[in-house]
Swiss-Prot record:
Primary gene name: lexA
Keyword field: Autocatalytic cleavage, DNA damage, DNA repair, DNA replication, DNA-binding, Hydrolase, Repressor, SOS response, Transcription, Transcription regulation
Family: Belongs to the peptidase S24 family.
Catalytic activity reported: Hydrolysis of Ala-|-Gly bond in repressor LexA
Enzyme Commission code(s) on record: 3.4.21.88
DNA-binding region: 28-48
Name the record gives this protein: LexA repressor
General function of this protein: Represses a number of genes involved in the response to DNA damage (SOS response), including recA and lexA. Binds to the 16 bp palindromic sequence 5'-CTGTATATATATACAG-3'. In the presence of single-stranded DNA, RecA interacts with LexA causing an autocatalytic cleavage which disrupts the DNA-binding part of LexA, leading to derepression of the SOS regulon and eventually DNA repair.
Active site: 119, 156
Residues under site feature: Cleavage: 84-85
Amino acid sequence: MKALTARQQQVYDLIRDHINQTGMPPTRAEIAAQLGFRSPNAAEEHLKALARKGVIEIVSGASRGIRLMMEDESGLPLIGRVAAGEPLLAEQHIEGHYQVDPGLFKPGADFLLRVSGMSMKNIGIMDGDLLAVHKTEDVRNGQVVVARIDDEVTVKRLKKNGNMVELLPENPDFQPIVVDLRQQTLTIEGLAVGVIRNGNWL
């Protein structure tokens, strides 16, 4: 791995710190603003140089598509967008690792999931939040779970009655998801045990 110039080290440190504080990499515009570049294109050139030196990977097609290669993979894996038909913790879904003590929660957190949408806002789970999840299939009615219906992953409150399962939102603008286990496949990926927002546990 080649040595970094002082400027490249600045860019790398900014990316690492941004991921540790917010759970996601910065955009090119954010890098440019933080380091005083004239434009996001200047940030892009530094990112390409870092990629050539093997310290980051640029993921095409995403404004935050930066993955650190030098980081040790300690901490909780952060799961972003999940592709259909693939395991939740598949390598390609892991955006990075978040340095937090999994023992802060009981039961302990095994991974973080980036929340998409506002269906659970009335209990304080907002779009973009990171949900701390304990990986288990042993859940009870009334608990907030991460569920996979066929190929879609969702966060909802569980209500099970025989072969019928309702996944209940915490927002009156959303309808419950009703699953007939005789016709659809439902997999419980885990139990919600906490929320992180803007780098702070709630």
